[in-house]
Amino acid sequence: MAVSTQQLAEELQIFGLDCEDSLLEKLAELCTLYRQTEERMVSELIAFCTSAGKSCLTGEILSSFEHEVLNKKLSKACHSASKDNRHAGARDIVSIQELIEAEEEEETLLSAYTTPSKGPHKRVSSTPETPLTKRSISTRSPHQLLSPSSFSPSATPSQKYSSRTNRGEVVTTFGSAQGVSWSGRGGSGSISLKVMGYPEPLTSSYKTMFQQLPDIREVLTCKIEELGSELKEHYKIEAFTPLLVPAQEPVILLGQIGCDSNGRLNSKSVILEGDREHSSGAQIPVDVSELKDYSLFPGQVVIMEGFNTTGRRLTATKLYEGVPLPFYQPTEEEGDFEQTMVLVACGPYTTSDSITYDPLLDLISTINHDRPDVCILFGPFLDAKHEQVENCKLTSPFEDIFKQCLRTVIEGTRSSGSHLVFVPSLRDVHHEPVYPQPPFTFSELPREDKKRVQFVSEPCNLSINGVMFGLTSTDLLFHIGAEEICSSSGTSDRFSRILKHILTQRSYYPLYPPHEDMAIDYENFYTYAQLPVTPDVFIVPSELRYFVKDIFGCVCMNPGRLTKGQVGGTFGRLYLRRQPKGTDSEGRQGLSVAAQVVRI
């Protein structure tokens, strides 16, 4: 759901309430997190301000509004939804009218495939008598390849997207970006791309829907024990105390954060689930009122110090900070490069009101103009949440539309020589919706493009000339941000907190239970979705606001999405330079990173 700060400002002005730009951005973030429209959010906010007797909008008022109104409404909604779900199956079975309507929809869909179109817009069909030859496909331009009439007879270009005036605007900058030409060498440079896996990367599909609850518990327990062992050694802790053993002196406990109910985690519902070795998986409620600074989310592995005088409740007084992994050390051959330009973009590649791929075609033009050494393209390429996909208005199979996208990008960027890396998304409607997600398969990849095109899994560890990239298309910031609770004595940046959690939990998806959109296979998750090292560059696309930040020496970028609702979005670009001699403060061979986020 795209949120407009301009519309928020207009709604506020109706009530005579002015707002600073920073607060508008915060309000837009709340709209996304709590899935509220601009009008609904402003109405709730005005009602809150009126009842509280506030005449101006401040950061403190927004924080109180989120805590007292939005959080409570979300908890109530989750509680009522859980009650409704108990009886949903029975209603589905006994509702004959719904079955009749479903059959009518299927017949309508079948007629859309079987009834030939009439008039000048008749589509070319491929039959055994008149096959569509490869030559006729390869000679078409990118615009012809992605002609929307080939898979949606009612497709029209987005008016808001085509009328945008801020294309090419740089919206945020990181590092010494001044003087950088932002143009690469395309295929003329020496580029080394290696997918790193420990012990090996995910390269093919696997059987799903076979996991049992004990298998999930085993993975979570192993994660607690592994992280606990690392933190125990780092902080020189002699031993952990079992959760349920009463003690009069301070104790140190190891466990995983959980919630005592089915609702959202809050300061009164925190529980600690112990490890198997010391606590046999027991649970204990946690009182966090004595902690001045904390940030917690379900699934987080923590070490807590406090008092457990009864063996039934822990009063926490100290929370040990997590420790990130060391950085990747490149070989002499990998580290021998001068500079590399990397472009990163994340789907959707269509606007919400149109199935035309104009934003993708504009991105191809940018690639051909700037000639980056490597282009990393994240899904979704055909978004499962697109209105025309949800309403079954496309007349071509999803797989065919996706292949047209791939063919357009590969052939359209051939002249630039740029290396292409494709990362799938759980929102790719044609692909396997399981996490970790295997790479795309494209058997029709031309031989001349095989050296410069690479399909990787979601998530993925990719070494580009010895610079380790962490890649994921999952919206970690949104998922963890919606579940996190925090208390801070000073100013605290939510994005930085979440990124620190990911790096110190050493996992691409440390949240448990996962978000409702996630179908996780935990056996493969334990093998393929862990961070083997702290990446030099971490790409975390999100619906939330774009940024580039330095977290523990790792450059973390949210390039935004290429489209935001009906308007254009943003993409990112990075300029990497490694000094031939010397090391930085993190013990790495000197690496300099400049980055920008740019509007399409």
UniProtKB/Swiss-Prot annotation:
GO cellular component, one term: alpha DNA polymerase:primase complex
Keyword Nucleus carried by entry: yes
Pfam families: DNA_pol_E_B, DPOA2_OB, Pol_alpha_B_N
Sequence positions bearing Phosphoserine: S126, S141, S147, S152, S154
Positions with biased composition (Polar residues): 125-140
Phosphothreonine sites (modified residues): T127, T130
Ranges of compositional bias, category Low complexity: 141-158
Post-translational modification: Phosphorylated in a cell cycle-dependent manner, in G2/M phase.
Segments crossing the lipid bilayer: none
Cellular location(s): Nucleus
A single BP term in Gene Ontology: protein import into nucleus
Keywords on record: DNA replication, Nucleus, Phosphoprotein
GO molecular function, one term: DNA binding
Function: Accessory subunit of the DNA polymerase alpha complex (also known as the alpha DNA polymerase-primase complex) which plays an essential role in the initiation of DNA synthesis. During the S phase of the cell cycle, the DNA polymerase alpha complex (composed of a catalytic subunit POLA1, an accessory subunit POLA2 and two primase subunits, the catalytic subunit PRIM1 and the regulatory subunit PRIM2) is recruited to DNA at the replicative forks via direct interactions with MCM10 and WDHD1.
Protein name (record): DNA polymerase alpha subunit B
Annotated organism of origin: Rattus norvegicus (Rat)
Record lineage: Eukaryota, Metazoa, Chordata, Craniata, Vertebrata
Gene: Pola2
